[in-house]
From Swiss-Prot:
Superkingdom field: Bacteria
HAMAP family linked: Ribosomal_bL21 (MF_01363)
Name the UniProt record assigns to this protein: Large ribosomal subunit protein bL21
A Gene Ontology BP annotation from the UniProt entry: translation
Similarity remark: Belongs to the bacterial ribosomal protein bL21 family.
Organism expressing this protein natively: Cupriavidus metallidurans (strain ATCC 43123 / DSM 2839 / NBRC 102507 / CH34)
Quaternary data: Part of the 50S ribosomal subunit. Contacts protein L20.
InterPro entries for the chain: bL21-like, bL21-like_sf, Ribosomal_bL21, Ribosomal_bL21_CS
S-S bridge residues: none
Function: This protein binds to 23S rRNA in the presence of protein L20.
Record has Disulfide bond as a keyword: no
Length: 103
């Protein structure tokens, strides 16, 4: 069984037992969270789509880590104008383990 969930403005296809890195969710490590925005649920060749959400469906997950992605380096330059700008960015993430899909 799998589900398509929406969290942090992005959509993820998940199944029970998988690990998933999503945009940061303010929760403690080991906390049980529920993802309520389920867009689709499927098992085998049967798929149930929501309009826009599947009613009564949710995904149970456990927070296993909070971290930061690798640094992304931004470099801007204007040729012949002596303009250079450097910037870096590290995005926070939450790593989840999908425990169960309730549909």
């Amino acid at each position: 069984m799998y589900a398509v969930v929406k969290t942090g403005g992005k959509q993820y296809k998940v199944a029970a037992g998988e690990k998933l890195k999503v945009e940061q969710i303010p929760a403690d490590i080991g906390a049980e969270i529920t993802l309520d925005q389920v867009l689709a649920v499927g098992a085998g060749d049967q798929i149930k789509f929501g309009t826009p959400l599947v009613s009564g469906a949710s995904v149970k997950a456990t927070v296993i880590a909070q971290g930061r992605h690798d640094k992304v380096k931004i470099f801007k330059m204007r040729r012949r104008k002596h303009y250079q700008k450097r910037q870096g960015h590290r995005q926070n993430y939450t790593e989840l383990r999908i425990e169960a899909i309730v549909a």
